[in-house]
């Protein structure tokens, strides 16, 4: 696909901040045709270094709460300031996605790019841990790394060059995720599908020099990418 919004984030400085396959491009594809209005209060769930949070604030005009457990909110705030964003429009929050510190029905929407698979595999997560903080009618938009077909009973050797079976347990196919989110009582499934983004977002990641990207090259150079995809899920709170 053509990444119209993301291309301005292809600078060396910003790309060095990504923590996996290019999350900005994944976020752009995820939000194609989205119904979230400008000035909506949005949680960037698992925001990492805050690059997707900047993208959401600048390109869509959302008021963004950049929630992440592992990133330093002080560092993220400095980054947001450097990017010229008003402090009232983007707020870094250090929090656990399973114990969010917000008022009930605080958010108009939630966007989660390349992180939901770490905390959202509990079938009660949506109903118990996330939806209480979303207004009725609000959207939950999720982009996650997945598998074209679950193969945990016979993992391909190419994948094991970079990842352990325990790490691969966080990745599943479309049917797994569709069945999981359909168990949610408080939200309707709008769509769940395989994303077009794959090889290009991986290429952006693999050319980085950090140790995690270097480690992932082993599997991808051996052809492991043919087993992998990205999955988008959109739900709406009832």
Where are the regions that the model predicts?
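A short SAM/SAH-binding and catalytic strip from SAM-dependent methyltransferases
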Residues: 109-122
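Class I SAM-dependent methyltransferase SAM/SAH-binding core
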Residues: 43, 49-99
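Short, glycine-/aromatic-enriched active-site segment of Class I SAM-dependent methyltransferases
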Residues: 145-167
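A short glycine-rich, Lys/Arg-flanked "PGG" loop and its adjoining helix->strand segment in the class I
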Residues: 124-139
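Conserved SAM-binding loop and adjacent beta-strand
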Residues: 12-28
């Amino acid at each position: 696909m053509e990444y119209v919004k993301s291309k301005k984030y292809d600078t060396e400085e910003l790309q060095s901040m990504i923590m996996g396959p290019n999350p900005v491009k994944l976020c752009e594809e995820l939000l194609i045709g989205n119904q979230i209005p400008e000035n909506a209060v949005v949680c960037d769930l698992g925001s990492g270094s805050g690059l997707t949070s900047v993208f959401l604030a600048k390109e869509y005009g959302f008021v963004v709460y950049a929630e992440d457990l592992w990133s330093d909110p002080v560092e993220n705030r400095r980054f947001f300031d450097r990017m010229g964003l008003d402090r009232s429009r983007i707020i870094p929050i250090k929090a656990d996605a399973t114990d969010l510190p917000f008022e009930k029905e605080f958010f108009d929407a939630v966007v989660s790019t390349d992180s939901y698979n770490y905390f959202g595999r509990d079938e009660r997560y949506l109903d118990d841990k996330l939806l209480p903080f979303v207004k009725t009618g609000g959207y939950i938009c999720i982009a996650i790394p997945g598998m074209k077909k679950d193969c945990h009973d016979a993992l391909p050797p190419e994948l094991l060059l970079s990842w352990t079976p325990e790490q691969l347990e966080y990745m599943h196919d479309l049917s797994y995720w569709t069945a999981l989110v359909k168990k949610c009582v408080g939200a309707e499934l709008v769509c769940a599908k395989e994303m077009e983004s794959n090889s290009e977002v991986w290429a952006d990641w693999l050319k980085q020099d950090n140790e995690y990207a270097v480690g992932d090259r082993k599997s991808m150079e051996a052809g492991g990418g043919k087993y992998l995809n990205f999955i988008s899920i959109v739900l709406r709170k009832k």
